[in-house]
C-alpha cells in the first residue's frame, strides 16, 4: 500500500500536468468573397489526426491543444486551398476571426455532384467587375473566355481570335499592334483588370502569357462606365499571385519561323502565406505569311500580394511589353475593278528595308482591399500606364489600273500617358425579408495621347513605280525623319486627351429568398476632352432577374451610354452628346448540375445624335445631324461538358445595324459598316478517358463562319462586298500530370481569307495565312 500511494500520486500529477498543458485552443469563422458563411469546409491540423468541418455559420474550433506551432489547412470543393500558421502558448485561446476563402475561378468554376468539371464554363465574373452576383443571376449578357479554351486553341494574343469563343464578336482591321474588336455593330473598348485603357490606336494587344481570363460584357454597362460606345467592352484579367505553388514552362514553334518561350512561377514567399508572388515572362520571335513582316515580342509581368491583416490585403502588379514590328505591312492594295483577294495571300506591299517600329508599354497597378466585417468592404485601385512608340507606317499614295503603285512611308512616333483611380464599396444588408447588395464608388481617368505622323514621303516615283503584278523589291530611297525636337513640342503634331470623373451607386434588391432580383442604379459622369467643354450626363440602369426554375433564369435590362460630340453646325452651335440606349431580355440556363450552360438574349440598341459632314460646306468644318442608328439582334452561347471526355463550345449571333431615323433623304435603311449579319463559332475538344488505350490523348476541332459581311466601310451602293468567311481549325494533344504536348493546325481547308474595304481610288484588305500550324510543349514543375 505504501508503494501504491506514491505511484498514484505521480500518475495524478502527470495526468493533471498533461491536461493543463493541453488546454489551448484556436477558432475562427470562414467566409466567401461575397461575405457569405461557408459551411462544411474541411479543416485539418498538419502532423495531427485532428479534422473537423465548419458549421452553418462558418465557425470552427480546435480545443485541448498543446503549446506549439500548428498549420491549419482549409479546403472546400470550388475554392482555393488555404493554410494558416499559428503558434499557441500554454492556456492560450486564439481567435483567428474572419478567414476568407477565394473561389477557384481558374479551376473549379462548374463542378457536378460527381466531381465532373465543365472546363469552359465560368460561374462568376472577376472581382475587377465589382459585381457580387453569379453570372447566371446577372441581368446582362456576360461571357467569359477562360485560360482552358485559350490553351486548347493555342491562342497567343488578342489578335489571334480569342473572341471566336463569344457570340457576335469580330476582329476588324488593325495595324498589327492592337486589337480592333467589334460587337453588336460597335467598337469595344479594351479594359484591363477593370480599367478602361482604350487609346486612339491602342492599347498594345495583350499576350496570353499574362492573361488569366477575358470577360466580354455586352451592351452599356453602367456598373463600369457610361462614357463609351454602346456595344459593350472586353476586360482582360491578368494572372494574380496564389497560395498554391505554381511553375510551368511553355515552348512553342510554328509556321513562318515562329518561336516562343514563356514561363509562369508563383506561390507563397513566407511560411504564414501572407506574402504571395507571381512572375510571368515571355520571348517571341515570329515571321508572317507575308514577306518582310517579322516581329519580336518581350513581356515581363511580376506581381505581389501581401496580407496586411486578416481584414486588409494589398496587391501590386507590374507589366512590361515590348513589340518590334513593321506597321502597315498587313495591308494589300489593288485597283478598284480587280476585286478583293485578287492578289495571293502571301503578297507583300513592303520591302525588307522599310523602317520598323518599336513599341513599349509599362503599367503599374496598386490595389488595397479592406473588409470592415462580414458584410462590408472597400477597395481602392490606382493604375498608371505609359505607352511609347517610335517608328513609321507604310501606306499607298496612288494606284493605276495596270498595277503601278506609289507607296509611301510616314513617321509614327507616339506617347500615351494615363492615370486611373477607383474607390468602391460593397455591402450586404436586409430590410425584413428583402436582401440588398449595394455598391457605390468613384472613378477617375486622365489620358493624353501625342503623335507625330506628319513627316513622310513617297518611296516610289512615276518613272520607277512598284507594280503589284510584277513586284521588284529593294532599291528604294526612304524619307529621313527629324526627331531632334521632343515629340510633345513638334509642329505640326496630333494630340488628344480626356478627363473623366464619375460616381456610381447601385442596389440589387432580392425578393422571395432572392429568387427575384431588381437592380436600381445610376451613374453621373463629367467628361472633359482636352481643350474642350465638359459634358455632364446622368445615366440610369435598371435590371430585373428572376429564377423561373432552379435551372432557368430570365432577365431584362435597360441601360445607357454616351459620347462627347465635338461637331458643330454652320452657325457654330454644338450638337447634343451622342447617346446610346439598350433594351435587352434573355434566358440563362444551367442543366445537369452544371454540365450544360447556355444563354439566349435579344436586344435593341439605339444610338442617337450621330452627325455627318455638311454636304454644302466646302471646308468640311461643319456637320449636320445624321440621325439614329439602330442595332438589333439575338445571340446564343453554350458551354457544355457533354460527357467526361467531350467538351463543346458553341455560339451564334444575328446582328442587324442600320440607320433607323435621319433627316437625310434615302439614308434610312443604310447598313452600318463593321459587322456580319450572321456569325457562328464552334469548338469541340475530346479527351480519351483514363481506361482507354489512348489515355492522355485528345483531339480538337473548331470552325468560324461569317455570313453577309460588311466591309470596314459601306460603299455608296449600300451593299456588303466581302464574301462569306469559313475557317476550320483542329489539333491533337497528349498530357499527363507534368507534361502537355499539342499540335494545332489552323485554316485546315487552306482558304483564302481576308477582310477589307475601299475608297474612291483603290481597294485595300488584309489577308490571313493559309494552312499553318504550331506545336506547343508545356512542362509543369509542381
Model regions and ranges:
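Outer-membrane beta-barrel translocator/receptor signature
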Residues: 210-212, 223-300, 308-312, 362, ...
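Acidic/polar loop-and-plug regions of large Gram-negative outer-membrane beta-barrel proteins
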Residues: 284, 288, 301-371, 386-416, ...
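Membrane-embedded beta-barrel scaffold of Gram-negative outer-membrane proteins
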Residues: 369-373, 377-383, 388-393, 579-641, ...
Amino acid at each position: 500500500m505504501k508503494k501504491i500511494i506514491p505511484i498514484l500520486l505521480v500518475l495524478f500529477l502527470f495526468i493533471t500536468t498533461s491536461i493543463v498543458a493541453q488546454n489551448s485552443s484556436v477558432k475562427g469563422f470562414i467566409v466567401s468573397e461575397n461575405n457569405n458563411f461557408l459551411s462544411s469546409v474541411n479543416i485539418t491540423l498538419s502532423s495531427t489526426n485532428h479534422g473537423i468541418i465548419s458549421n452553418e455559420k462558418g465557425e470552427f474550433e480546435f480545443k485541448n491543444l498543446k503549446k506549439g506551432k500548428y498549420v491549419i489547412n482549409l479546403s472546400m470543393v470550388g475554392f482555393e486551398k488555404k493554410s494558416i500558421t499559428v503558434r499557441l502558448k500554454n492556456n492560450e485561446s486564439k481567435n483567428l476571426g474572419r478567414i476568407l476563402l477565394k473561389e477557384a475561378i481558374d479551376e473549379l468554376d462548374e463542378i457536378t455532384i460527381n466531381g465532373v468539371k465543365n472546363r469552359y464554363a465560368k460561374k462568376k465574373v472577376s472581382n475587377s467587375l465589382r459585381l457580387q452576383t453569379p453570372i447566371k443571376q446577372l441581368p446582362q449578357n456576360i461571357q467569359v473566355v477562360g485560360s482552358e479554351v485559350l490553351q486548347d486553341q493555342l491562342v497567343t494574343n488578342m489578335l489571334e481570335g480569342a473572341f471566336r469563343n463569344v457570340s457576335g464578336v469580330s476582329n476588324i482591321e488593325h495595324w498589327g499592334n492592337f486589337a480592333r474588336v467589334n460587337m453588336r455593330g460597335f467598337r469595344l473598348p479594351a479594359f484591363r483588370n477593370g480599367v478602361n485603357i482604350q487609346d486612339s490606336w491602342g492599347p498594345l494587344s495583350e499576350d496570353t502569357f499574362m492573361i488569366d481570363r477575358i470577360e466580354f460584357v455586352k451592351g452599356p454597362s453602367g456598373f463600369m462606365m457610361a462614357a463609351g460606345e454602346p456595344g459593350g467592352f472586353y476586360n482582360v484579367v491578368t494572372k494574380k499571385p496564389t497560395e498554391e505553388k505554381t511553375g510551368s514552362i511553355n515552348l512553342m514553334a510554328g509556321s513562318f519561323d515562329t518561336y516562343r518561350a514563356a514561363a509562369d512561377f508563383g506561390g507563397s514567399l513566407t511560411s504564414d502565406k501572407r506574402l504571395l508572388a507571381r512572375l510571368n515572362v515571355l520571348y517571341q520571335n515570329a515571321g508572317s505569311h507575308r514577306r518582310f513582316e517579322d516581329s519580336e515580342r518581350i513581356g515581363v509581368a511580376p506581381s505581389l500580394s501581401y496580407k496586411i491583416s486578416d481584414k486588409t490585403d494589398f496587391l501590386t502588379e507590374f507589366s512590361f511589353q515590348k513589340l518590334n514590328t513593321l506597321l502597315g505591312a498587313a495591308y494589300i492594295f489593288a485597283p478598284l475593278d480587280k476585286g478583293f483577294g485578287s492578289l495571293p495571300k502571301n503578297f507583300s506591299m513592303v520591302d525588307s528595308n522599310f523602317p520598323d517600329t518599336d513599341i513599349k508599354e509599362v503599367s503599374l497597378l496598386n490595389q488595397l482591399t479592406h473588409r470592415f466585417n462580414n458584410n462590408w468592404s472597400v477597395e481602392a485601385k490606382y493604375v498608371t500606364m505609359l505607352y511609347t512608340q517610335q517608328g513609321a507606317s507604310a501606306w499607298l499614295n496612288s494606284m493605276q489600273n495596270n498595277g503601278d503603285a506609289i507607296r509611301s512611308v510616314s513617321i509614327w512616333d507616339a506617347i500615351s500617358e494615363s492615370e486611373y483611380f477607383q474607390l468602391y464599396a460593397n455591402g450586404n444588408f436586409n430590410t425584413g425579408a428583402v436582401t440588398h447588395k449595394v455598391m457605390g464608388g468613384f472613378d477617375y481617368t486622365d489620358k493624353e495621347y501625342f503623335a507625330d505622323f506628319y513627316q513622310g514621303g513617297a518611296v516610289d516615283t512615276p518613272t520607277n513605280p512598284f507594280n503589284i503584278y510584277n513586284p521588284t523589291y529593294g532599291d528604294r530611297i526612304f524619307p529621313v525623319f527629324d526627331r531632334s525636337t521632343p515629340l510633345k513640342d513638334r509642329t505640326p503634331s496630333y494630340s488628344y486627351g480626356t478627363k473623366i470623373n464619375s460616381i456610381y451607386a447601385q442596389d440589387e434588391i432580392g425578393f422571395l429568398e432572392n429568387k427575384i432580383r431588381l437592380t436600381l442604379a445610376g451613374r453621373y459622369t463629367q467628361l472633359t476632352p482636352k481643350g474642350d467643354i465638359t459634358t455632364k450626363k446622368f445615366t440610369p440602369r435598371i435590371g430585373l432577374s428572376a429564377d423561373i426554375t432552379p435551372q432557368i433564369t430570365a432577365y431584362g435590362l435597360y441601360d445607357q451610354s454616351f459620347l462627347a460630340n465635338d461637331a458643330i453646325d454652320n452657325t457654330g452651335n454644338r450638337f447634343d452628346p451622342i447617346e446610346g440606349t439598350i433594351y435587352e431580355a434573355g434566358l440563362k440556363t444551367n442543366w445537369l448540375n452544371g454540365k450544360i450552360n447556355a444563354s439566349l438574349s435579344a436586344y435593341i440598341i439605339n444610338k442617337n445624335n450621330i452627325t455627318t459632314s455638311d454636304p454644302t460646306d466646302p471646308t468640311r468644318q461643319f456637320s449636320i445631324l445624321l440621325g439614329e442608328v439602330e442595332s438589333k439582334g439575338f445571340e446564343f452561347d453554350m458551354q457544355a461538358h457533354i460527357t467526361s471526355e467531350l467538351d463543346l463550345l458553341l455560339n451564334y449571333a444575328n446582328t442587324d445595324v442600320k440607320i433607323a431615323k435621319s433627316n437625310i433623304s434615302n439614308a434610312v435603311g443604310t447598313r452600318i459598316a463593321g459587322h456580319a449579319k450572321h456569325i457562328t463559332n464552334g469548338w469541340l475538344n475530346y479527351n480519351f478517358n483514363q481506361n482507354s488505350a489512348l489515355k492522355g490523348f485528345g483531339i480538337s476541332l473548331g470552325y468560324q463562319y461569317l455570313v453577309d459581311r460588311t466591309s470596314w466601310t459601306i460603299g455608296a451602293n449600300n451593299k456588303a462586298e466581302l464574301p462569306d468567311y469559313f475557317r476550320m481549325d483542329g489539333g491533337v494533344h497528349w498530357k499527363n500530370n507534368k507534361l502537355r504536348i499539342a499540335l494545332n493546325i489552323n485554316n485546315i481547308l487552306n482558304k483564302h481569307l481576308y477582310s477589307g474595304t475601299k475608297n474612291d481610288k483603290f481597294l485595300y484588305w488584309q489577308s490571313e495565312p493559309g494552312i499553318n500550324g504550331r506545336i506547343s510543349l508545356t512542362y509543369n514543375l509542381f
